[in-house]
UniProtKB/Swiss-Prot annotation:
It is an enzyme of class 4 (lyase). There is a cross-link at A144-G146 (5-imidazolinone (Ala-Gly)). One of its GO terms (cellular component) is cytoplasm. Keywords: Cytoplasm, Histidine metabolism, Lyase. Belongs to the PAL/histidase family. Pathway: Amino-acid degradation; L-histidine degradation into L-glutamate; N-formimidoyl-L-glutamate from L-histidine: step 1/3. Its EC number is 4.3.1.3. PROSITE patterns: PAL_HISTIDASE. This is Histidine ammonia-lyase. The modification 2,3-didehydroalanine (Ser) is found at S145. Contains an active site 4-methylidene-imidazol-5-one (MIO), which is formed autocatalytically by cyclization and dehydration of residues Ala-Ser-Gly. Its main location: cytoplasm. It comes from Halalkalibacterium halodurans (strain ATCC BAA-125 / DSM 18197 / FERM 7344 / JCM 9153 / C-125).
């Protein structure tokens, strides 16, 4: 893609980020925002020249904030900050997260409150456009005073140090910069602090988690529709009158979509035909899935605010006339949103696993035990339910809120922190587990409807089944099902799913 997205510090959306992250859209900076950057930079240079005592510009950091820094040591101060704070550990963030961090940090600096030179922003954008993505360890951030350790690893690359992902491999930053003819920079007053004082690690991880979660939320309804057919579920539960009586718009949306997917099915039933009511995991799909959608809307709102937020400290206002120390680096808003996201997505896996149980348990349906082609000789999909149960149980541990914890740091100067980056990492892992649980439900549901007879399926779900069988063949004998789960999950993650039909059933006046 050759389209150019101009960042301005105030209008970046999740839709924009999706194009930049996954479609390779290039980025630049708006002229208006760059003018603001230049004005705030003049203020920083004047503060240094006048030897004013301003935190982070002419003082040390954290507990050292009461130590004045000589003008001759200002550059050294900024470089020492990056080197000393680049102490993350663990596996690196996914490359998509690293790319998102670059975009978000540039966008925050373009608000013009941080006092960096335009050159710093230009270099960040150059890395994005050259597909040079810093290798950033996932562990080590408290989520206040910003994501210090992760962003320090990002900042190292601007100096020509550290490691990057480049052309599919991990290599030295100096090599990648040379290949792309990007000159390393020397940091001057406040620039080191401006690069690392922010919430861009937790927010970037949150963006990727959200984008994957939204796709899974749609897919979970389609998979549940297949399960409804496999279990001859009662369609009356999706009558919109029930859901209007409750009043939650997201619940109504889910019910409408489910009813639409199944509208011409000969496998679903009406109340009283086979049974009076279905179990909750079928009957309450709109209520449970709808509640997850409520959470997704909330998380989206918070992410898009944070994506365009000034999270530095201090901030420069009124064309440099006012420099104020504050706490916009504190990640509590995103920390809470990420905990909420993890909990809501874990619930999709919880209810999915219960539907899996109903598909494989012969006491709960009239299908062959464990959907086996030769019960007894073959185990069928018995252990797939075990795997789903394990993932669901793991999610319950991961869903424990990170934001309720806080450990003081910097000699108790930073005595309350958000742990938001832990929360975003946990939410992301939960979402990976949810995808695998849904992949298992998909495998079981496809097997069930094929046993019932696909000629009786709804036209929409039949198309899904036909596409799904390209990835997971019909199970006529036991095989190594790990590969089936892997292929199904890959289809859910990377496959092209047309959500047009789904969005048609949303109440557009709400979104």
């Amino acid at each position: 893609m050759t389209n150019l997205k101009l960042l301005d510090g105030r209008s970046l959306s999740l839709h924009d980020l999706h194009r930049i992250i996954y479609e390779g859209e290039t980025v630049g900076a708006s002229d208006e925002s760059m003018e603001k950057v230049k004005q705030s930079r003049k203020a920083v240079e004047q503060i240094v020249a006048d030897e004013k005592i301003i935190y982070g510009i002419t003082t040390g950091f954290g507990k050292f904030s009461d130590i004045f820094i000589d003008p001759d040591d200002v550059e050294n101060l900024q470089h020492n900050l990056i080197y000393s704070h680049a102490c993350g550990v663990g596996s690196p963030f996914p490359e998509t997260v690293s790319r998102t961090m670059l975009v978000l940090r540039a966008n925050a600096l373009l608000k013009g409150f941080s006092g960096v030179r335009p050159l710093v922003i230009e270099r960040l954008l150059a890395l994005v456009n050259a597909n040079i993505h810093p290798v950033i360890p996932q562990q080590g951030s408290l989520g206040a005073s910003g994501d210090l350790a992760p962003l320090s690893h990002l900042a190292l690359v601007l100096l020509g140090e550290g490691e990057v992902f480049y052309k599919g491999t991990k290599t030295k930053a100096s090599f990648a910069l040379k290949e792309e003819e990007i000159e390393p920079i020397t940091l001057t007053a406040k620039e080191g602090l401006a690069l690392i004082n922010g919430t861009q690690a937790m927010t970037a991880m949150g963006v990727i988690a959200y984008l994957e979660a939204e796709k899974l939320a749609f897919q979970s309804e389609i998979i549940a529709s297949l399960t409804m057919e496999g279990l001859r579920g009662i369609i009356d539960a999706f009558d919109e009158q029930i859901h209007f009586a409750r009043g939650y718009v997201e619940q109504v949306d889910v019910a409408r979509r489910m009813e639409s997917y199944l509208q011409d099915s000969q496998l679903t039933t009406r109340q009283g035909e086979l049974r009076v009511q279905d179990a909750y995991s079928l009957r309450c799909i709109p209520q449970v899935h709808g509640a997850t959608w409520q959470t997704l809307r909330y998380v989206k709102e918070k992410l898009e605010i944070e994506m365009n937020a000034a999270t530095d400290n201090p901030l420069i206002f009124d064309n440099g006339q006012k420099v104020i120390s504050g706490g916009n680096f504190h990640g509590q808003q995103i920390a809470l949103a990420m905990d909420f996201l993890g909990i809501a997505m874990a619930e999709l896996a919880n209810i999915s696993e219960r539907r899996i149980e109903r598909l494989v348990n012969p006491q709960l349906n009239d299908l062959p035990p464990f959907l086996s082609a030769a019960p007894g000789v073959q185990s069928g999909v018995m252990i797939l339910q075990y795997c789903a149960a394990s993932l669901v149980s793991e999610n319950k541990t991961l869903a424990h809120p990170a934001s309720v914890d806080s450990i003081p740091s910097s000699a108790n100067q930073e005595d309350h922190v958000s742990m938001g980056t832990i929360g975003s990492r946990h939410a992301y892992q939960i979402i990976q587990n949810v995808r695998n649980v849904l992949a298992i439900e998909l495998i079981c549901a496809m097997q069930a409807v094929d046993i019932r007879g696909r000629e009786k399926m709804a036209s929409f779900t039949k198309k899904i089944l036909e596409k799904g069988r390209e990835h997971v063949p019909y199970i006529d004998q036991d095989r190594m099902f790990a590969k089936d789960i892997e292929r199904a999950a890959k289809w859910l993650k990377d496959g092209s799913w047309d959500f047009t039909k789904m969005r048609e059933k949303e109440r557009t006046n709400h979104y």
